[in-house]
UniProtKB/Swiss-Prot annotation:
Alphabetical list of Pfam families matching this protein: tRNA-synt_2, tRNA_anti-codon
Gene: lysS
Biological process (GO), any one: lysyl-tRNA aminoacylation
Protein name: Lysine--tRNA ligase
Cofactor: Mg(2+)
Binding, Mg(2+) 1: E400, E407
PANTHER family recorded: LYSINE--TRNA LIGASE, CHLOROPLASTIC_MITOCHONDRIAL, LYSYL-TRNA SYNTHETASE
Enzyme Commission number(s) from the entry: 6.1.1.6
InterPro entries with a match to the protein in the record: Aa-tRNA-synt_II, aa-tRNA-synth_II, aa-tRNA-synth_II/BPL/LPL, Lys-tRNA-ligase_II, Lys-tRNA-ligase_II_N, Lys-tRNA-synth_II_C, NA-bd_OB-fold, NA-bd_OB_tRNA
Length: 491
C-alpha cells in the first residue's frame, strides 16, 4: 500500500482550513441556486452600457472555481469563461470566517446583480456567497501551466484547468465527433453498437488484449476492429451502418499510436471502392468547411497541405516500383528477398511476395505522401477481408488514405464470397503458425453469415484520434486523448 507523501506547507494550511470549516458545519454542500447560462449572459449583456445596469437590475447566479483574487475582485472560472465578481469589504467582513478560510482553487457559488466596472468589464456584484468545495492543493500557475509533459498527461484535469489551448482541443474533438455523426446521419446511415469482447480474433491485423470470461470459462479478446459484426448487419438488411467506438490493440505507443483508441467504421451496401473513396474525401471536406479551416493552405507538421484539390490516387505496386527504381511486377519472390536484404528490410518467416511489396511501400513511398493521397491495390496476403482484383487476383480492391506520411483511413470493396473468405482465414492460420502474431483466426460465425448472402458493399475505417491531431494541428496523439496510456510512474 502506497503511503501518502509528507504534505508541504501549502497543503497543510489548506487542510487546517478545512478542519476549521468542518468544525463549523461545512460538509461539501450541494448547490442551492438555479445557475444561469453565462455564455448567453455574456452575449446578451457584454455590450450594454454602465447606465443600462443602473436603470435595470439583472440578477444572475452561477458557481465556479476561484482562480484569482485582487482585493474585492474575485475571478471565477465557470462554463469555460472567466467571470469577475465584486465582493465588497463589508460583505467579506460580515462573512469573515468563510473568507478567512478561502483559497484559490476553491469552488464557490454566488448570486447578485450585473454591473460594468470603470474599465467597462461586465461583472457581478455579489450579495449571496457559499463555499461548495475546498481545494486541498494549490493550482498550477495560470501562465506557465504544467511544464512537465508526463505530469500534464497524468493530471489532465489540472492541465485543462490552466491551459486554455488543451481545453480548446478537447472541445474541438467533441465537435469533430459530433460533425462526423451529422455527416453520416444526414445520408441515412444508422449508428450501431457492437460487442467490445470477441470470442474470435478478427477484423484487422493486430496483437490483441486477452481477458477471461468467468461465466463462460473462455478467453475473449478486446476488439481490434468493428468490421465483422458491422458486415453481419449488412447481411441483416441494414444497408448503411457505422460505429464510433473504442478499439484495443496490444502494441506499442508513439506520437501517432495509442493501444486504446477511437475509430469510426462505416459500411454501405451496393457501394464500390470508388464510392467509398469519394465518401471519405467528402467527409474531410465537410469537416474543413464546418470547422472553418482553410483547405487550400493547411499548415500541419511544418508542411503546407492542399485539401481543396481532388485527392491523388496511385496504384501501390506502380508508385513503389517507380520510387524504388525497381520493377516489382516482374520480380519473383527470390528477387524481392535479395532486394529486401540490400535495403535492410527485415524478413519474417511467414512473408510472401505481397508482404515484401508492402514493406517496400512503407519504406520508400509512405513518407513522401504529404498531400492527401489514396494508395490502391494492396497485395492479397495483407488484405484478407477485401475483394481480390478480378484483373489481377494477387492484389485487392483496397485503398488507404495517407496525409503527411501517415495513414488516416483504410477502405475495401468488401469480400462477400464465403468460400473465398474461409480460404483467406485458413491462410491467416498458416501465417499465425509461422509466427505472425497479428494474423486473424477463423471466424466461422462470420463465414456462415456470408453464406446467407451479403450484398456487395464498401467499407472504411478512420482513426478519430489521428484525425483530431490533424484538424487541431497537434503532432502527438497524447495531446488529443484525454487520458493517454503512460508508463507506470516511479516512486
Amino acid at each position: 500500500m502506497k503511503i501518502m507523501s509528507k504534505l508541504n506547507d501549502q497543503q497543510q494550511f489548506r487542510r487546517d482550513k478545512l478542519k476549521n470549516l468542518v468544525k463549523n458545519g461545512f460538509n461539501f454542500p450541494s448547490s442551492t441556486f438555479e445557475h444561469d447560462n453565462l455564455v448567453e449572459i455574456n452575449e446578451k449583456f457584454s455590450q450594454k452600457s454602465k447606465e443600462f445596469f443602473l436603470e435595470n437590475q439583472v440578477k444572475i447566479a452561477f458557481a465556479g472555481r476561484l482562480i484569482r483574487q485582487r482585493g474585492p475582485f474575485f475571478i471565477i472560472f465557470s462554463q469555460n469563461l472567466q467571470i469577475q465578481a465584486y465582493i465588497s469589504k463589508k460583505f467579506q467582513k460580515k462573512n469573515e470566517f468563510i473568507f478567512a478560510n478561502l483559497d484559490l482553487g476553491d469552488i464557490i457559488e454566488v448570486s447578485g446583480y450585473l454591473f460594468k466596472t470603470q474599465t467597462g468589464q461586465l461583472s457581478i456584484k455579489v450579495n449571496n456567497f457559499s463555499l461548495l468545495t475546498k481545494s486541498l492543493h494549490p493550482l498550477p500557475d495560470q501562465y506557465y501551466g504544467i511544464e512537465n509533459p508526463d505530469e500534464k498527461y497524468r493530471k489532465r484535469y489540472l492541465d485543462l484547468l490552466v491551459n486554455s489551448e488543451s481545453a480548446k482541443t478537447f472541445r474541438l474533438r467533441s465537435k469533430i465527433i459530433s460533425l462526423i455523426r451529422t455527416f453520416f446521419d444526414s445520408q441515412g446511415f444508422l449508428e450501431v453498437d457492437t460487442p467490445v469482447l470477441h470470442p474470435v480474433l478478427g477484423g484487422a491485423s493486430a496483437k490483441p488484449f486477452i481477458t477471461y470470461y468467468n461465466s463462460l470459462s473462455q478467453n475473449f479478446y478486446l476488439r481490434i476492429a468493428t468490421e465483422l459484426p458491422l458486415k453481419k448487419l449488412l447481411v441483416a438488411g441494414f444497408d448503411r451502418v457505422y460505429e464510433i467506438g473504442k478499439i484495443f490493440r496490444n502494441e506499442g505507443f508513439d506520437s501517432t499510436h495509442n493501444p486504446e483508441f477511437t475509430s469510426i467504421e462505416f459500411y454501405q451496401a451496393y457501394a464500390n471502392l470508388e464510392k467509398i473513396m469519394d465518401q471519405t474525401e467528402n467527409l474531410f471536406r465537410f469537416l474543413f468547411e464546418k470547422l472553418n479551416l482553410d483547405p487550400a493552405n493547411f499548415d500541419f507538421s511544418n508542411k503546407k497541405i492542399n485539401f481543396l484539390e481532388k485527392f491523388a490516387r496511385y496504384d501501390m505496386i506502380e508508385i513503389t516500383s517507380k520510387l524504388m527504381n525497381f520493377d516489382l511486377k516482374s520480380a519473383n519472390f527470390a528477387d524481392l528477398v535479395e532486394k529486401a536484404k540490400k535495403e535492410g528490410v527485415k524478413i519474417e518467416p511467414f512473408f510472401k511476395k505481397g508482404h515484401l511489396i508492402n514493406k517496400f511501400f512503407e519504406k520508400f513511398v509512405e513518407p513522401t505522401l504529404i498531400n492527401p493521397t489514396f494508395i490502391i491495390g494492396h497485395p492479397i496476403e495483407i488484405s484478407p477481408l477485401a475483394k481480390s482484383n478480378p484483373n489481377n487476383p494477387n492484389f485487392t480492391l483496397r485503398a488507404e488514405l495517407f496525409i503527411c506520411g501517415k495513414e488516416f483511413a483504410n477502405m475495401f470493396d468488401e469480400l462477400n464470397d464465403p468460400i473465398d473468405q474461409l480460404s483467406r482465414f485458413q491462410a491467416q492460420i498458416i501465417e499465425k503458425n509461422q509466427g505472425n502474431q497479428e494474423a486473424s483466426e477463423i471466424d466461422n460465425e462470420f463465414v456462415q453469415a456470408l453464406e446467407y448472402g451479403m450484398p456487395p458493399a464498401g467499407g472504411c475505417g478512420i482513426g478519430i484520434d489521428r484525425l483530431t491531431m490533424l484538424l487541431t494541428k497537434n503532432e502527438s496523439i497524447r495531446e488529443v486523448i484525454l487520458f493517454p496510456q503512460l508508463k507506470p510512474k516511479k516512486d
